[in-house]
Amino acid sequence: LRLRHYIIIFLFVLTGCSADSAEAIKPDQSITDSITLTPVDLAQGETAKLRPFLGTMSGAFKLRYEGEKPSASLDMDIWENGVKVDSAGSIGDLFFSPEGQVNNSNEIEVIISIDTVRTEEDKEVGIVKISTGSGLATFTLPWNSELKGRGLIQNTETLTFTPDHPVHTFAMHATSSNQVFAGGFSEESLSKIEWALVFTLRFDE
C-alpha cells in the first residue's frame, strides 16, 4: 500500500513538471510587431568612406523589425505647397533577403543620395539613388530650376512604431526664395513647405 502511495505521488510530480515545461516553451503572445528607425551619421563609421560618392543631399538610417517580417515599401512622394501631389517612385519588399543568404537579418540600412545634373539638352534633372543593402535603385525626376535653396528633413532620434500606419523617414525640401527653414515631419511643418521629396515607409496589410 505504501509503495502504491509513492507511485501516485511520483506521477503527480512528473505531471506537474511536464506542465511547467510546456508553459515555459509556450510562445509569448504579448510580443507585438514593431519597427525601430535609427538615424545614421554618414560622416562616422563604415559609411564615411561612401561620402565622396554621394550627392550633396544625402542621409541614412537603419530599420529593424521585431516580430513578424513586415511587407514594407519605401515610397517617394512629391509635395507642393504643403500637400502631396504626386508619386515619384517606390521600392517594394524593403526587407528582402537574397535566397540562400546565411544571415537572414531583421535589420537593413537605407542610404539615400539626391543630386541634380544637367542633361545633354541642358535640362536640369534630379537623380535619386537608394541603397537598401540588398540592392541599389536609381530614379530620375524632372527638376524645377527655379528651386534654388535646398535642405534636408531627417529624424534625429531613434523611433519605434508599429507597422500599421505610414511613417515619414527622410525628405529633401526646396524653395524658390533661397531661404531654407528648419523643419520636421509634423503636419504643421509639412504644411509650410513649397516643394519636397518625402520618403515614406508604408506597409501592406
Regions found by a protein language model. Name each.
Residues 20-83:
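Short N-terminal edge-element motif at the start of the domain
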